[in-house]
């Protein structure tokens, strides 16, 4: 097939891949179920049971070969024991304050089910909000601050898409799940962290409607807040070539490549000028809620003599200038 470029700067291969290979690639991804997932109730608490399939190790090795050939910096945990250790350890590190995780059998990890729904579900139902995106960004930033011996540095997820972010509407808290994938351990922490942001943002790029996607991306990046990582993200916002493009197709739900390319360009501009965007947003917020110059900090209780409340009270009690101070008395 010729590999020239059209007017939009897209190769002919990239134009035909969504139409010719999207269904096949989607089927392949769906069939690539390294682990099976089920739910049960144990001791009156619902648990998620993740079990490594019989051919899971071979499938993981096959996927890792594709990642390596395509220069995609992630891999599956192919060995069952390694996966169980990593899955349980990450879940406990991030969610062990409220929820338990335990091994059950040689190929199984059991995790208490987190309350809420994934941001992926909210996005597809049209119920995704900016508050949810802020909660996700705060949780990812929190997770990135944990030290991990496997990396000999800060931890990263490796697959931080919206399907793996659970949001609890009652508490307003987001939590991360699903730790089957790990980043290449040779990568610097900022590169790994930027890749986590990229994976999350590609869901927004591929699915969210035109008028919402950029404000959503801005809200997420502002809430994440680490400008060094966001600067590194700018270097990763370009459509890849060759076989790596198929994985990006999966990440963006095989959205139109021209649309993805245009949105990535806007994201690059956003990341390059995020500091300016944040300054403008802060100024607007200050203009909307200017503090009164007559308000003073005070402790609860009796108002001070100089306070505005007491001054108003005294003024209300004062006699009018035209009113005599005493009523006339009869003699």
Where are the regions that the model predicts?
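Juxta-kinase regulatory segment immediately upstream of eukaryotic protein kinase catalytic domains
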Residues: 2-29
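ATP-binding glycine-rich loop module of kinase domains
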Residues: 35-82
